[in-house]
From Swiss-Prot:
This protein's name: Cytochrome b
Binding site for a ubiquinone: H201
Positions annotated to bind heme b b566: H97, H196
Keyword annotations from UniProtKB, A to Z: Electron transport, Heme, Iron, Membrane, Metal-binding, Mitochondrion, Mitochondrion inner membrane, Respiratory chain, Transmembrane, Transmembrane helix, Transport, Ubiquinone
Function: Component of the ubiquinol-cytochrome c reductase complex (complex III or cytochrome b-c1 complex) that is part of the mitochondrial respiratory chain. The b-c1 complex mediates electron transfer from ubiquinol to cytochrome c. Contributes to the generation of a proton gradient across the mitochondrial membrane that is then used for ATP synthesis.
Length: 380
């Protein structure tokens, strides 16, 4: 009699994705981040669900309801701290996952990669609307500043902003709809994740050598299920440590003050994981130009597969492009630092130079380096 997991219509799907999935034998720890993202998503949905049971999306009670969750609800403080810091870990894992994709040429699986970029955009939208919900000062002013960017859209900008707001300013209608979006988007992300996996399993995983691994595959379970489990333990250890020992480390002190439309905080800035994009936005002294640069700072990932000029897939044996990759990592860190700084000298010029370098590496230097490496191999 055949094994039930191989014959049952539902179990067969799970089996092909998690148990009998043929995986390259040489994939490293960098391939752990996909499953870690799944864990992050599950954690966020679960903690978010419990928070939603006690939260009220009304401007007169939102801030108080968050205080109530932390003070009166059983383990509410823990659920909130895990949810707030879980978002940070989510983005750490996303950026690591994307970095691995860029380093090892995983972007050549175009459908998987493009759905991944869509997933990144969805996650960023979810995090943004979620940050507005506690209705603190930075929540309110962050919502005002970022939604106002839509007014840069020619002709329909003003109407678009009022449509998003549900009025003439960020008000009760805005908070209510943002809560609705924040509840809905994680399930959209989960659905897109299924598509992401569907397309990945059409081709199979890439590997550090960047070559076809059909001749040397091993089953996902038990080898990589246990390897992923180690990653789970490491991440959950980090998350719980942060949530228990330094829950407000990554937050903004301004968000402990209830939203006040009459008082603008001295420095309006988003959470740390958006600072690189915020720095790119601020580095262009034109509203529409800044918004386009902000959008393209993420959408540039979609053109990476088109601009792949090398005959080798990954960067394992390509020292020139390796240098560019690490220059990009350093540049992202500089942009993140600048995004949190006030708009004054020397931060303005540093941000502008870093923004130019960011786009130059993606659009000019990487394709050139790939081409140069091919030439060098031909001459060798």
């Amino acid at each position: 009699m055949a094994n039930l997991r191989k014959t049952h219509p539902l179990l067969k799907i799970a089996n092909d994705a998690l148990v009998d999935l043929p995986a390259p034998s040489n994939i490293s720890v960098w391939w752990n981040f996909g499953s870690l993202l799944g864990l992050c998503l599950a954690t966020q949905i679960l903690t978010g669900l419990f928070l939603a049971m006690h939260y009220t999306s009304d401007i007169s009670t939102a801030f108080s309801s968050v205080c109530h969750i932390c003070r009166d609800v059983s383990y509410g403080w823990l659920i909130r701290n895990i949810h707030a810091n879980g978002a940070s870990f989510f983005f750490i894992c996303i950026y690591m996952h994307i970095a691995r994709g860029l380093y090892y040429g995983s972007y050549l699986y175009k459908e998987t990669w493009n759905i991944g970029v869509v997933l990144l955009l969805l996650t960023m939208m979810t995090a943004f609307v979620g940050y507005v919900l506690p209705w603190g000062q930075m929540s309110f002013w962050g919502a005002t500043v970022i939604t106002n960017l839509l007014s840069a859209v020619p002709y329909v900008g003003g109407a678009l902003v009022q449509w998003i707001w549900g009025g003439f300013s960020v008000d009760n209608a805005t908070l209510t709809r943002f809560f609705a979006f924040h509840f809905l988007f994680p399930f959209v992300i989960a659905a897109a994740t299924v598509l992401h996996l569907l397309f990945l399993h059409e081709t199979g995983s890439n590997n550090p050598a960047g070559i076809n691994s059909d001749a040397d595959k091993i089953s996902f379970h038990p080898y990589f299920s246990y390897k992923d489990l180690l990653g789970f333990v490491a991440m959950l250890l980090g998350l719980t440590s942060l949530a228990l020992f330094a829950p407000n480390l990554l937050g903004d002190p301004d968000n402990f003050t209830p939203a006040n439309p009459l008082v603008t905080p001295p420095h309006i800035k988003p959470e740390w994981y958006f600072l690189f994009a915020y720095a790119i936005l601020r580095s262009i002294p034109n509203k529409l130009g800044g918004v386009l640069a902000l959008l393209f700072s993420i959408l540039v990932l979609m053109v990476v597969p088109i601009l792949h000029t090398s005959k080798q897939r990954g960067l394992t044996f390509r020292p020139l492009t390796q240098f560019l990759f690490w220059a990009l990592v350093a540049d992202m860190l500089i942009l993140t630092w600048i995004g949190g700084m006030p708009v004054e000298h020397p931060f303005i010029i540093i941000g502008q130079v870093a923004s130019v370098i960011y786009f130059t590496i993606f659009l000019v230097l990487s394709p050139l380096a790939g081409w140069a490496e091919i030439k060098a191999l031909q001459w060798a």
